[in-house]
């Protein structure tokens, strides 16, 4: 299943979520993080490919009422400085380690990852197990997600991927020339009709940054590989370990669109493979759950935010109960 970049979305005024804090992570680089609420364990959120902080706007407030909730921008995204290194899962998790350490985020925390962010969250839990108390994975990417494809399916996926990469590269070039704005979207800038003025300003600024498009291009290159495991997948597979008895909830979208040229049989097989991958992630914990969320597309946190809020709440309660033993 080919993961495309996350569309922009907006539904309510969320000023607190957009008021971040730049943290020096070393090497002359700063990364943006915003933490809301109070309580323990902290919940740390990782958005998907091409995402932004507004991807969490429907869940940020309610979860901040339950505990401390921290949201951040990866290198090149939002207000975070770009990295000179490739945006591999290993490098992304390395950055997150130092950001959370320098920001003083208390460990262990609950890691919440969406889409590609789910693969990053999984690898982080593999690499730094003592820092992660539990996981909520929202329609996550996973190692081997494309290995069920026939030669015909691989060819279609390769064509879609090539078109996507070409468009991202085109948008990056336009951004470098300062030619992207809400007045000149050029097929790159998408501002929701229901966005507030503050959200529209924020999104327009994000789309206008060439570093964002460069980061997306690098992330996509390291996520997808025709007929083989990608660099990100290899990194996760090499580091894979049991999650023991840590609470893990994996949420799967119930609305999965058919790809161009895909037959009903191919689509059914792809959906089954996607769910099976999520089941395997949940099975790495003795307290893992794999749940299909009704009436939800890939953007579960926007379509069915209560499902995400409830999953985080349940993992938080499980972690707190374990501490009281």
Regions found by a protein language model. Give the residues of each.
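Active-site loop/oxyanion-hole signature of alpha/beta-hydrolase fold enzymes
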Residues: 34, 71-112, 128, 142, ...
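Active-site nucleophile loop of the alpha/beta-hydrolase fold
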Residues: 136-146
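Conserved HGGG/HGGXW glycine-rich cap/lid loop of the alpha/beta-hydrolase fold
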Residues: 25-79, 127
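The conserved beta1-alpha1 loop
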Residues: 44-48, 114, 139
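Residue in the alpha/beta-hydrolase core beta-strand immediately N-terminal to the catalytic nucleophile
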Residues: 109-110, 133-136
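Alpha/beta-hydrolase
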Residues: 151-280
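Catalytic active-site module of serine/aspartate enzymes centered on a nucleophile-bearing elbow/loop
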Residues: 284-325
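Gly/Ala-rich beta-loop-alpha elbow adjacent to hydrolase catalytic centers
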Residues: 113, 117, 121
């Amino acid at each position: 299943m080919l993961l495309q970049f996350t569309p922009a979305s907006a539904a309510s005024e969320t000023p607190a979520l957009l008021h971040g804090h730049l943290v020096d992570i070393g090497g002359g680089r700063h990364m943006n993080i915003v933490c809301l609420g109070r309580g323990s364990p902290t919940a740390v959120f990782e958005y998907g490919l091409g995402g932004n902080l507004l991807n969490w706007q429907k869940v940020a407030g309610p979860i901040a009422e339950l505990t401390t909730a921290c949201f951040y921008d990866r290198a090149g995204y939002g207000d975070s400085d770009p990295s000179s290194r490739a945006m591999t899962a290993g490098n992304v998790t390395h950055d997150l380690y130092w950001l959370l350490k320098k920001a003083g985020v208390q460990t262990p925390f609950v890691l919440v990852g969406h889409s590609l962010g789910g693969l990053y969250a999984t690898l982080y839990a593999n690499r730094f197990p003592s820092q992660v108390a539990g996981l909520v994975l929202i329609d996550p990417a996973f190692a081997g997600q494309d290995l069920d494809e026939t030669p015909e399916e691989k060819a279609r996926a390769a064509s879609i991927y090539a078109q996507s990469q070409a468009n991202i590269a085109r948008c990056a070039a336009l951004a470098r020339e300062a030619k992207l704005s809400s007045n000149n979207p050029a097929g790159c800038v998408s501002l929701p009709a229901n966005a507030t003025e503050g959200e529209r300003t924020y999104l327009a600024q994000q789309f206008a940054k060439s570093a964002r498009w460069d980061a997306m291009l690098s992330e996509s290159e390291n996520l997808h590989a025709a007929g083989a495991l990608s660099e990100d997948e290899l990194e996760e597979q090499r580091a894979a370990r049991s999650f023991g008895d840590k609470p893990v909830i994996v949420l799967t979208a119930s609305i999965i669109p058919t790809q161009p040229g895909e037959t009903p049989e191919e689509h059914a097989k792809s959906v089954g493979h996607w769910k099976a991958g999520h089941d395997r992630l949940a099975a790495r914990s003795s307290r893992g759950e794999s749940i299909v969320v009704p009436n939800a597309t890939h953007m579960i946190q926007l379509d069915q935010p209560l499902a995400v809020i409830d999953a985080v709440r349940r993992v938080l309660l499980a972690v707190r109960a374990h501490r009281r033993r």
